[in-house]
């Protein structure tokens, strides 16, 4: 960590999570002379949603998450969103592979492991849905290796815990993508920030809180930073600012004063996992098994039983159980939600509250659940689960986007959204899932939008193609490019399956 703070930087990164670390890495690879400073109010990087245990660690390729493939009225399934997320994850794999090849990440097994992704449903209607989904997805080259089975012995071979003790007459179906991954985004964030901190023209400042940000007369930004150790305050100017501060992003967007952020708000959702560290159990489950959310439930309610590999230790995670907290960050304040209310966003927020009563009911139900009720949900996936083998763990806070719509109206968004100033000198990332898995895709979009001059006229595009070989290629269409890059990155990242 740097002891001195430069008064002027080219790029200021606010927040030291996976998003800022990814954007900073790409920018420094494209132009090593860029002067970049990263500010984080906590004492380490990756401590909020990027933290290893604050997210599910799914290499989010839309292999198994059924909320990305909604049914159509005619009985078919819409797979367009799944294909987008699937190929966006390929960009992250390419960036990581480049860093491994360059020696900037020594061993990819420090953050990523092969882990099959499975969808698991029961009941005639759900089985019919999953089979239709499989038929459509496996016909596309992006999912050509997807497997489907209703055979109970086959399912038990793939995931024994979900079958042992189950009613033999229950109608079941699964899909399986053997090439899925488990990603430790906390470890990855540390690896990215470490290699950044070893470069010239990069400053890292922990325990430094950005308390205000305003446009200056030169078109750049004045950033007021407080050293939380000494309580000294500093003024830094930056040509470009990226806010990747998770739940803090709403506050900094509002302080920036950019008109593009007017009317935006946030709706915080807390999460709880059940976690099992017993080797005798975790060693018998090697998959991320996603179920189907109840009709009318929000996307955050999709239950899943996951293998997690963190610091070489295999564990299991089940959940999430959602709840409500007015905090925007785990290390935040209970006043966060109330302090985010402005005249410009109060009507969209009230409109969302009025139109999303089902979400309110769902969250109330989750908050009122007893531990016994929570455990019954686990037993739907793992019938022989025992209370004593599991402990409760608090997940990261997710702040869903409340977005202004027509006059005085608002909509609740469950994805991520990048908001930039008109002159492209300021960007902020709002939202949650799929988040970390598509960090490279988001960073590339920032570069295309906010560094267009450098990309087109200063050689950045050729350098970007060296880092991301399929840049400019639509992997949803080019089957050969898709197969080739997946084989290449699997080899470099040591993800090859038997």
Curated annotation (Swiss-Prot):
Keyword Flavoprotein applies: yes
InterPro entries registered for this protein in UniProt: FAD/NAD-bd_sf (IPR036188), MQO (IPR006231)
UniProt catalytic activity: (S)-malate + a quinone = a quinol + oxaloacetate
EC supergroup of this enzyme: oxidoreductase
Protein family according to the UniProt entry: Belongs to the MQO family.
GO biological process: tricarboxylic acid cycle
Pathway the protein contributes to: Carbohydrate metabolism; tricarboxylic acid cycle; oxaloacetate from (S)-malate (quinone route): step 1/1
PANTHER family, per database record: L-2-HYDROXYGLUTARATE DEHYDROGENASE, MITOCHONDRIAL
Gene3D superfamilies: FAD/NAD(P)-binding domain
EC number: 1.1.5.4
The entry's keywords: FAD, Flavoprotein, Oxidoreductase, Tricarboxylic acid cycle
Name used for this protein in its record: Probable malate:quinone oxidoreductase
Cofactor: FAD
HAMAP family: MQO
């Amino acid at each position: 960590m740097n002891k001195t703070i430069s008064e002027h930087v080219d790029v200021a990164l606010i927040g030291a999570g996976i998003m800022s670390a990814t954007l900073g890495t790409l920018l420094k690879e494209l132009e090593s002379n860029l002067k970049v400073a990263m500010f984080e109010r906590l004492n380490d990087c990756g401590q909020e949603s990027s933290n290893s245990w604050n997210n599910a660690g799914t290499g989010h390729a839309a292999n198994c998450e059924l909320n990305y493939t909604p049914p159509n009225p005619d009985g078919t399934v819409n797979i367009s969103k799944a294909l987008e997320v699937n190929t966006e994850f390929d960009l992250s794999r390419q960036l990581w592979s480049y860093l491994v090849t360059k020696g900037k990440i020594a061993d990819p097994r420090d953050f990523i492991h092969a882990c099959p992704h499975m969808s698991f449903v029961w009941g005639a209607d759900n089985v019919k849905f999953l089979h239709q989904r499989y038929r459509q997805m496996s016909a596309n080259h992006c999912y050509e290796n997807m497997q489907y089975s209703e055979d109970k012995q086959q399912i038990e071979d793939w995931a024994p815990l979900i079958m042992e003790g189950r009613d033999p007459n229950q109608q079941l179906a699964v899909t399986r993508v053997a090439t899925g991954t488990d990603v430790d985004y906390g470890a990855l964030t540390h690896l990215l920030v470490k290699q950044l901190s070893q470069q010239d023209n990069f400053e890292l400042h922990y325990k430094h809180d950005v308390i205000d940000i305003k446009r200056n007369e030169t078109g750049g930004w004045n950033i007021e930073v407080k050293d939380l150790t000494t309580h000294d305050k500093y003024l830094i100017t930056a040509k470009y600012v990226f806010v990747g501060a998770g739940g803090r992003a709403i506050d900094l967007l509002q302080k920036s004063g950019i008109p593009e952020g007017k009317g935006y708000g946030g709706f915080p959702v807390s999460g709880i996992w059940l976690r099992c560290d017993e080797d005798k159990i975790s060693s018998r489950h090697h998959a991320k098994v996603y179920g189907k959310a109840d009709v009318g439930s929000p996307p955050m309610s999709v239950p899943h039983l996951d293998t997690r590999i963190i610091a070489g230790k295999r564990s299991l995670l089940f959940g999430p159980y959602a709840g409500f907290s007015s905090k925007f960050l785990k290390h935040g304040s209970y006043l966060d939600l109330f302090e985010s209310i402005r005249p410009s966003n109060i009507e969209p927020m009230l409109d969302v509250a009025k139109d999303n009563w089902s979400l309110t009911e769902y969250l109330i139900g989750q908050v009122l659940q007893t531990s016994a009720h929570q455990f019954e949900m686990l037993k739907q996936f793992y019938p022989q689960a025992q209370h004593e083998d599991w402990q409760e763990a608090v997940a990261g806070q997710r702040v869903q986007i409340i977005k202004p719509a027509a006059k005085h109206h608002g909509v609740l968004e469950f994805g991520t959204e990048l908001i930039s100033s008109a002159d492209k000198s300021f960007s902020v990332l709002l939202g949650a899932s799929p988040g970390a898995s598509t960090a490279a895709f988001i960073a590339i979009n920032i570069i295309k939008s906010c560094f267009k001059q450098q990309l087109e006229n200063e050689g950045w595009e050729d350098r970007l193609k060296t880092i991301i070989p399929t840049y400019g290629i639509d992997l949803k269409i080019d089957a050969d490019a898709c197969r080739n890059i997946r084989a290449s990155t699997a080899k470099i990242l040591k993800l090859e399956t038997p």
